[in-house]
């Protein structure tokens, strides 16, 4: 069970400023979540092999094979704007 001191600590770590009505709801939600974990803790896992991942995924990568290289003139013709031999694109990150 989450008590007021633990909620204050979690709120501080998460940089949350909780109103009194939010504190009650947050406490109830966290206790509900912890209740689910308690149910999981009670599951008998004897004989179940530990896994690093729930699904065995393997990356299947192909060999890098050099392909067709476009001539600089073709790239320049396709680019919206060129500057100093490089493609100019719109700014995506604003400077502070």
Swiss-Prot record:
A single GO BP: glutaminyl-tRNAGln biosynthesis via transamidation
UniProt feature coiled coil, ranges: none
Top-level EC class as recorded in UniProt: ligase
Cited Pfam families: GatC
Documented EC number(s): 6.3.5.-
Homology family: Belongs to the GatC family.
PANTHER family linked: GLUTAMYL-TRNA(GLN) AMIDOTRANSFERASE SUBUNIT C, MITOCHONDRIAL
Subunit structure and binding partners: Heterotrimer of A, B and C subunits.
Function statement: Allows the formation of correctly charged Asn-tRNA(Asn) or Gln-tRNA(Gln) through the transamidation of misacylated Asp-tRNA(Asn) or Glu-tRNA(Gln) in organisms which lack either or both of asparaginyl-tRNA or glutaminyl-tRNA synthetases. The reaction takes place in the presence of glutamine and ATP through an activated phospho-Asp-tRNA(Asn) or phospho-Glu-tRNA(Gln).
Name of this chain's protein: Aspartyl/glutamyl-tRNA(Asn/Gln) amidotransferase subunit C
Gene name as annotated: gatC
